[in-house]
């Protein structure tokens, strides 16, 4: 006999960004709708415009990569929405909902395939691991802002 817990995926939180390209095209409503339809609970959300320095701190892991300057310029180019999402297996589930980084390679029906225009303008960001999610959530939200 098996216990139900053996087959369940843990309830977890992940971090998401609706990027400046999506906001400038007015796609945040569609993306928020898809988040809801996918079964996520939005724990926290805020809209803001990052400074280049804030974007650099957030993407510090990429500091030595050749695209770092372009990435921080882009992420500070307009308003973003930062979100904390909760669901069973939230990290993988959000990555599946977003689709592959390059919209051309993303599965049909994913956010990036349907709404993204290029690798650089792919609408969304999502944490790739629990440790990354913890850092990213803490970068944008204090514990008092989380339900």
Task: Describe the function of each predicted region.
Residues 2-147:
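Non-catalytic terminal and connector segments of soluble metabolic enzymes
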């Amino acid at each position: 006999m098996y216990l139900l817990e053996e087959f369940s995926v843990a309830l977890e939180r992940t971090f998401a960004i609706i990027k400046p390209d999506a906001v400038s095209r007015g796609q945040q409503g569609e993306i928020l709708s898809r988040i809801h339809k996918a079964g996520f609970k939005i724990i926290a959300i805020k809209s803001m415009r990052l400074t280049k320095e804030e974007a650099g701190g957030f993407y510090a892991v990429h500091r030595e990569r050749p695209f770092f300057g372009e990435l921080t310029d882009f992420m500070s180019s307009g308003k973003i929405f930062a979100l904390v999402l909760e669901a069973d297996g939230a990290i993988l589930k959000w990555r599946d909902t977003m689709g592959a980084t390059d919209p051309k390679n993303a599965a049909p029906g994913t956010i990036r395939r349907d709404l993204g225009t290029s690798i650089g303008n792919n609408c969304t960001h999502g944490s790739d691991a629990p440790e990354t999610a913890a850092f990213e959530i803490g970068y944008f939200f204090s514990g008092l802002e989380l339900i």
